């Protein structure tokens, strides 16, 4: 919108409307609300003859309180003047209004010109019989009754309207997009009026349908499909608990999940007193209740089923015994379980003892620590080892109260107290013997002196001698 108050004829160029305001404008107080009508290319006539129009020299008349003040609008050299032939017309569109001053309530204490929209449209040749007419939107005698602004509108011919409201070119089609997203805007514009002369009032902007809330998933694929990395939706867990497929661990986990098995019962039964095997030969096979022995394990050559728990061969003990020829306290007939390994002459009275011993040869360690994954051949060794992790010390010393995790450690510690006790007991006996040897000759001398003293004192000696004699 353009707002102006003028008292004199003001020459204004078109470029001046677009860029800057002339310095000759100044406000005039107490002016009535005017009405402005612009006829740049039309002819005067019709029911608005009483209004001011454009003169032949291109002047625009603005009606201000009944006075006629022409306004020069010289066109620049690049535009053809109005008197030029009408094979090519230039149409200027604009809206002018004058803001009256409100006492104490206006944001603009002085009237100024505000250019809201102005444009030069070119390229439409109207027919010779086409005329332009104008009408004022407010027909009330007092324009201020409807509002503070007086709006001047213009009416153009049918071809000009077609040029003004021609739809913009459609956007370029995008690959992968359907026609539902972008539709032709001309379908939403109302068709222009069919009459050659019409009055255009302010029309609201056309209403466009809202876009679809949900888009086709095939339009813009945000996440590409990688069948090599992610499984198909039908293979995924419906609850979302299962993640993408992972490669299997290269090392087998069975050794970590499943504990090593114990010695099978069939192996233990092979070394019981059930009798010699069918393949046992030799003179010593039936004597002394001997169990099955491997070839070369004794004086008699015996052929029997080798001991192979989990196909583990029997290996000789590399560390020799501390006392190889030490006689056992238990007689031989009470130790019916000999060791089947070559070069080992151990015998046991219980089968579980033989089983523990055979693990020394085979290297079988069925007991595993779940904390450090260390394996042991005996369960008691595993029990004492676990105490190193837990810090448990169930064995306490009877003398000092010190605690130990193993009973043999407490036993070694107790021997220290026993040796100290022996030393303490031997020290008083030696000191007592030394005192007795030193007090022997001294006691006789004291007795002699005492006797001498008593002899010296006659009546005391006779008294004592009298009392001692019956």
Swiss-Prot record:
SMART domains: ZnF_C2H2
Region (Disordered): 126-153, 159-178, 184-211, 275-344, 408-470
Post-translational modification: Ubiquitinated by WWP2 leading to proteasomal degradation. Acetylated at Lys-247. May be deacetylated by HDAC6, HDAC10 or SIRT1.
Basic residues bias (residue ranges): 412-422
Keyword terms of this UniProt record: Acetylation, Activator, DNA-binding, Metal-binding, Nucleus, Repeat, Transcription, Transcription regulation, Transferase, Ubl conjugation, Ubl conjugation pathway, Zinc, Zinc-finger
Cellular compartments annotated: Nucleus
First and last residues of each zinc finger (C2H2-type): 337-361, 367-389, 395-417
EC number assigned by the record: 2.3.2.-
Subunit structure and binding partners: Interacts with HCFC1. Interacts with WWP2. Interacts with UBC9. Interacts with CITED1. Interacts (via phosphorylated form) with SFN.
Function: Sequence-specific DNA-binding transcription factor. Plays a role in hindbrain segmentation by regulating the expression of a subset of homeobox containing genes and in Schwann cell myelination by regulating the expression of genes involved in the formation and maintenance of myelin. Binds to two EGR2-consensus sites EGR2A (5'-CTGTAGGAG-3') and EGR2B (5'-ATGTAGGTG-3') in the HOXB3 enhancer and promotes HOXB3 transcriptional activation. Binds to specific DNA sites located in the promoter region of HOXA4, HOXB2 and ERBB2. E3 SUMO-protein ligase helping SUMO1 conjugation to its coregulators NAB1 and NAB2, whose sumoylation down-regulates EGR2 transcriptional activity.
Protein name, as recorded: E3 SUMO-protein ligase EGR2
């Amino acid at each position: 919108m353009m707002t102006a108050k003028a008292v004199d004829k003001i020459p204004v160029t078109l470029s001046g409307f677009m860029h800057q305001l002339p310095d000759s404008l100044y406000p005039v107080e107490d002016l009535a609300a005017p009405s402005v009508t612009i006829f740049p290319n039309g002819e005067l006539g019709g029911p608005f003859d009483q209004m001011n129009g454009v003169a032949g020299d291109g002047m625009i008349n603005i009606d201000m309180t009944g006075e006629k003040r022409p306004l020069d609008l010289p066109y620049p050299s690049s535009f053809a003047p109005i008197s030029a032939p009408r094979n090519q017309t230039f149409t200027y569109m604009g809206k002018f209004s004058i803001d009256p001053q409100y006492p104490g309530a206006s944001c603009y204490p002085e009237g100024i010109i505000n250019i809201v929209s102005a444009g030069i449209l070119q390229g439409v040749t109207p027919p010779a019989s086409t005329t332009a007419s104008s009408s004022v939107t407010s027909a009330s005698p007092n324009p201020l009754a409807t509002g503070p602004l007086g709006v001047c509108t213009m009416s153009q011919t049918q071809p000009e309207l077609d040029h003004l409201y021609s739809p913009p070119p459609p956007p370029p089609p995008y690959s992968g997009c359907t026609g539902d997203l972008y539709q032709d805007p001309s379908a939403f514009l109302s068709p222009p009026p069919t009459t050659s002369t019409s009055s255009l009032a302010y029309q609201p902007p056309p209403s466009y349908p809202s876009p679809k809330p949900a888009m086709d998933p095939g339009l813009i694929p945000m996440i590409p499909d990688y069948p090599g990395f992610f499984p198909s939706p039908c293979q995924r867990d419906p609850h979302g608990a299962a993640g993408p497929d992972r490669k299997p661990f290269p090392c087998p986990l069975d050794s970590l999940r499943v504990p090593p098995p114990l010695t099978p019962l069939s192996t233990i039964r092979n070394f019981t007193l059930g009798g010699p095997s069918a393949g046992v030969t030799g003179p010593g096979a039936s004597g002394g209740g001997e169990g099955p022995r491997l070839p070369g394990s004794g004086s008699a050559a015996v052929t029997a089923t080798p001991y192979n728990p989990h196909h583990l061969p029997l290996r000789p003990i590399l560390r020799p015994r501390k006392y190889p020829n030490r006689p056992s306290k238990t007689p031989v007939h009470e130790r019916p379980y000999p060791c089947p390994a070559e070069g080992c002459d151990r015998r046991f009275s219980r089968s579980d003892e033989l089983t523990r011993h055979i693990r020394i040869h085979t290297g079988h360690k069925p007991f595993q620590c779940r904390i450090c994954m260390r394996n042991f051949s005996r369960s008691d060794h595993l029990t004492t080892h676990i105490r190193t992790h837990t810090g448990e010390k169930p064995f306490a010393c009877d003398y000092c109260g010190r605690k130990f995790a193993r009973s043999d450690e407490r036993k070694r510690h107790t021997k220290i107290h026993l040796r100290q006790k022996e030393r303490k007991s031997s020290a008083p006996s030696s000191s007592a013997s030394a005192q007795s040897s030193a007090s022997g000759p001294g006691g006789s001398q004291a007795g002699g002196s005492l006797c001498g003293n008593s002899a010296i004192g006659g009546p005391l000696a006779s008294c004592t001698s009298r009392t001692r004699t019956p």
